[in-house]
Amino acid sequence: MEQRHLGRTGLRVSRIGLGTLTWGRDTDEHDAADVLKTFWEAGGTLVDTADVYGDGGAEYLLGRLIEGLVPRRDLVISTKAGSVPDPDRRFDGSRGHLLSALDASLTRLGTDYVDVWHIHAFDPGTPLEETLQALDLAVSSGRARYAGVSNFCGWQLAKAATWQLAAPGIRTRLASTQLEYSLLQRGVEREVLPAALDLGIGLLPSSPLGRGVLTAKYRNSTPPDSRGASEHLAPFVAPYLDDTASRIVDAVQTAADGLAVTPLQVALAWVRDRPGVTAPVIGARNAQQLTAALSVEALSLPDEICRALDDVSAPVHRYPDHDWSTL
């Protein structure tokens, strides 16, 4: 699998990442082992997790698998901290919480470092410089090799990255940012992606298949074994089952038919090759799903197909998102 630099750093990662959102919950150890081995054998390196996935079960399961199944040195492990199960405070970006969470992640993963450590979300209740200091301490102590953020909007990302570049002392520049990005969700193109490109921050799109909807499996009904049929994941899929999404899925299906490939391959290739994208993160629940996704490695979409998909899925950009002179 082709490797790409993560932002403006020397770290290289596979251009498709493996997500573990369902590990330890909907994906058991047997399926997770098959998925990880398939990913590794295909040349995949980037494995993304978080301390809240499966209430820590995803990290624990990944740690068990890298003990004997896949060499730790062959993987680029990314995890996240900051989300908390508190209805009154969804995110905790305090230095104390973040560093404690990182230590707990390392214990579950059975490793003394992670390759990339992300702040899971912006915490308005904590000064940003305190949150960023946790990144500096994690890297300077050797517990993390690189650092990034997740779910930061444009101004939050720009402020964080600029602080790390300009503040006095030894600071850790942001290597990456992780947000949802697909043909069904192009909101990052308004401000986040331009900021990331300008600041040399690699984008790791989550849900690049539109929460599974862009595979076209929901066109006629909800498959009983899908996330849309899962009690706790159905609300996650539901926003992308409207008429607007249906038109985009139809266009993806048409493109796939014309290229003799699958809708999954078209949707994944589109986001993988967008400017600024380092590696979309896919959440395959079994090896069969992963193999289907990895088959996109040899596919590059023709320009005319990209333009057609761009047009049908184009987000609404108004002032001041675009230069006023073009409006």
Task: State where each predicted segment sits.
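Active-site mouth loops of central-metabolism enzymes
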Residues: T20-H30, V84-L99, H120-T126
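Conserved beta-strand positions
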Residues: L18, T49, T79, V116-I119, ...
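N-terminal binding-site loop/beta-alpha segment at the start of enzyme catalytic domains
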Residues: M1-L75
